[in-house]
Amino acid sequence: VTGLCVTCGVISGVARAQVPERREATVDFVYFTGTPRTDEARGGTAPATLRVEKNTASGASVGVIEEFAGGTGTQWRSTAWIAAFTASGRAEQSFLANEFTVRTGGHVDGPSAGMLTTAAFLALMRGDAIRPEVTMTGTINPDGTTGPVGGIPQKLMGAAAQGKKFFGYPVGCRQSEDLKTGAVVDVEALGTQLGVTTVELTTLADAYLLLTGVPLAVHAPIDLEAMRIAPDLLETTKIRVDMWRSTAEAGFARVQPILNAMDEPTRTSLRWITSPIFGAVQQATAAESAGQTIAAEHKWMEVATATAAAEDSLAILAAANAGKLDDAFNVLVPYLELEDQAKAMLGELGESVGTANNTVGAVNAVLAAEGVVGALALVGAGKGGLASAVATIKQLETSTTPESAAANNERVRAFLMLLLKTAPVLARAEATLAAARMDIAFGGTSEQGGAAVQADRLASLAKAYASASAAGKVYFQAIVGLEDSASGAFAFAEPRWATASMGTQLAADFAGRDGAVERVIALAAGAEGYLSSASLQNKYYALEYKQGVIARRPALTAQLAAARTSALAAAGDLQRLTGVLPSRIVTEFNYAEELREGSDDDKIDALAAYGRTSFAAELAAELGR
């Protein structure tokens, strides 16, 4: 492996693909349909023609052409966007350089064609022929790893019926449920029975080799020793652990007297407010005792967040019990100042790119800006909650009839519940922004290195990630059935959704603007939105996460291993490219290492952290091209 040469445009000895004038190919996608556990459950294939040609527009250009109006569902459309974006990165071409088109027949939908669509688009960009006897199923993650899907036995049988000889499926899914019988089926044994060779796919490279017979360059992973945390970085992390612990303890010192003054029934009735504190303390203490310093920092931050939310919630209830609804509302109003603070920080980070003008400095600024964008997104979700509370209380009636009194009581209860749901979101926003400040204060943007950043490259990436973020948001909403009307409520329960939705909006607002500051904000917001949506899609759809438990456990184990390998390879490329391995990337990787053997929630966070390691390293390479 020779690494990447910025001046000659060669990566690992393979010439960078050129933008094609026009290339197209037809592939057969697999699907399943019918009601599970009935004879209607069956699989099949559907042809689609994919085309790649030079883009003459200034922005991204991805289209789906239908045989019938409405014949292609939202999931399928979003899959095409994400596949085009991912394939462009692997081909080392700007997402904006090509126009991508998919022509479908009949009625198709579903999210499981991500890997096949990506591999096919990549083959068109590289000029490699697609083998007609091959098909596959599986989602694709931003780091190029595959995600599990359902209905694999039915899809395999459908592929065999159409004469396919090779069938790829996601790693960890060899034992898959037959949707007709409910029995667990060995996919490889079923393939042998049907005369189809089955291939377990871990990454896009596996899928590409199966689809084209051509191997992609596989980059050597960095040595693990290079990813160890330096002693000085470890010491600064311990300082931040102490800071978060002190913040949490100070907050609880304010909460405890309020609880002590209550009678036991009242304390018991409010346990839903205080129990998150004790659960978070237990996790933070365990991480610290195990020497998991980075995880301990994050978990003590969770304690501080839970404590602040509890303090605010108790203040809201106290004001409401005194009949002072305005005071209850005003408990949360000071948090709105975070918006201006976050925007000022984003401006400073954007200006730092123009000053330093090198790939490592730019990546550090973008990563720091992502944390600020996360805080800004949470403030946006909180503002939505407060606006709903105001709208509710404005509906109070002046009539004194029993019916009006009952209706008013319901509105007051709804008003208070909105405030109580908003309190944790705004507390998290404050903690997230504080964490971003700490990161910058402890030298999180000081490292420099690599080639100069071209302004047009920064602008192109900002537009690309804004488009990818929008596609990812729509994709997730479609596969879980999240309506726009329920989006705000879901953000209260799942902070990543606030980041995904508000990050997408912020990226769209800034993507077309001129100036380094605006481009850094757009890139950071788009990347944060895209990565958050992808993490949610993997969590709730691919891994079937429900009530704190993951259903597809073998796939989770396989994903963790694949994401880890991908992160190490990306870090190795970055070091060879710039001669620098930013401490931020090292920290993110080690955070994943500390979490990967923890609870299911920890494992989900570990996957996200490995993914962010890959993203940061790949972004540096993209900026340096």
Question: Which residues does each PLM region occupy?
Answer:
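Acidic, serine/threonine/proline-rich low-complexity intrinsically disordered regions
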Residues: 540-552
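Sec/Tat signal peptide C-region and signal peptidase I cleavage site
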Residues: 11-16
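Short helix-adjacent coil turns
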Residues: 279, 284-298, 363, 370, ...
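Peripheral, non-AAA+ core regions of ATP-driven protein-machinery
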Residues: 18-282, 313, 322, 326-376, ...
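Generic signature of mature, soluble extracytoplasmic domains
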Residues: 267-319
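C-terminal amphipathic alpha-helix
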Residues: 303, 307-310, 314-334, 370-543, ...
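Bacterial N-terminal signal peptides
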Residues: 1-9
